Amino acid sequence: MTEKSDSTTHFGFETVPEHEKAGRVQGVFNSVASKYDIMNDVMSVGIHRIWKDAMMDWLAPRPGQRLLDVAGGTGDISFRFLKRAGHGHSTVLDLTTPMLEEGRKRAEAEQMAECLDWVTGDAMALPFKDNTFDVYTISFGIRNVTRPQEALNEAYRVLKPGGRLMVLEFSQLPNDGLQKLYDLYSFNVIPRMGQMIAGDYDSYQYLVESIRNFPDQETFLGMVKSAGFENAKHRNLSMGIAALHSGWKI
């Protein structure tokens, strides 16, 4: 117990006690919930939509599959999954209830409420039985988890044999010059956009810092394999600004 309370982790570029991170992340997303989808479009100039389509292309949802969409927030991945599958079911889990409320509103507007469950919960301690889901997705969320390896271990636990993990996350550009240009944009433009559109500079400063702190593609691939996933692979998107990681529970 003492060891856990003494452990630290990153909150952006700040080092904080592990037990504080979840609450601080929750505060960030409570603050940005109502503007989250708009800000995604503005920050990425709409490219996040292309990345999510690429995620669905690789995932190839099938009718009747059961999805667990972790850190699913407003349900963007779940809506895409269900439309591609034709019919199925998605459980959206997120630490932040206001994000889920935004998703519920959208589900009702799109007449998809019966296909979706909304659960407030922690990626490191999923409230589901072993071998429950066909697919586990986490999109732009795992970098906000206090201990990402534990989240991956939980993903493995709740997937059925033959189930698939798919992670979409910001990553690292392979070229130092391009990375410096991207950092220049990220640190100087995105927080200011957050202030202008969402009235929140600090939350978007954290989001930018959390992107920069996240492991590179090969390091994260090793974490996926360590959780037990087989045939683990990654694909770069937009030269490595983001990356997809896939693995199977065999």
UniProtKB/Swiss-Prot annotation:
Annotated Pfam families: Ubie_methyltran (PF01209)
Enzyme Commission (EC) number: 2.1.1.163, 2.1.1.201
Catalytic activity as recorded in UniProt: a 2-demethylmenaquinol + S-adenosyl-L-methionine = a menaquinol + S-adenosyl-L-homocysteine + H(+); a 2-methoxy-6-(all-trans-polyprenyl)benzene-1,4-diol + S-adenosyl-L-methionine = a 5-methoxy-2-methyl-3-(all-trans-polyprenyl)benzene-1,4-diol + S-adenosyl-L-homocysteine + H(+)
GO biological process: aerobic respiration; menaquinone biosynthetic process; methylation
Pathway the protein contributes to: Quinol/quinone metabolism; menaquinone biosynthesis; menaquinol from 1,4-dihydroxy-2-naphthoate: step 2/2; Cofactor biosynthesis; ubiquinone biosynthesis
Key words of the record: Menaquinone biosynthesis, Methyltransferase, S-adenosyl-L-methionine, Transferase, Ubiquinone biosynthesis
Residues given in the record as S-adenosyl-L-methionine binding sites: T74, D94, D122, A123, S139
CDD domains on file: AdoMet_MTases
Keyword ATP-binding: no
MF GO annotations: 2-methoxy-6-polyprenyl-1,4-benzoquinol methyltransferase activity; demethylmenaquinone methyltransferase activity
UniProt enzyme class: transferase
Known role: Methyltransferase required for the conversion of demethylmenaquinol (DMKH2) to menaquinol (MKH2) and the conversion of 2-polyprenyl-6-methoxy-1,4-benzoquinol (DDMQH2) to 2-polyprenyl-3-methyl-6-methoxy-1,4-benzoquinol (DMQH2).
Entries under PANTHER family matching the protein: 2-METHOXY-6-POLYPRENYL-1,4-BENZOQUINOL METHYLASE, MITOCHONDRIAL, METHYLTRANSFERASE
Family as reported in the entry's similarity comment: Belongs to the class I-like SAM-binding methyltransferase superfamily. MenG/UbiE family.
Name this polypeptide is given: Ubiquinone/menaquinone biosynthesis C-methyltransferase UbiE
Organism: Ruegeria sp. (strain TM1040)
Gene behind this protein: ubiE
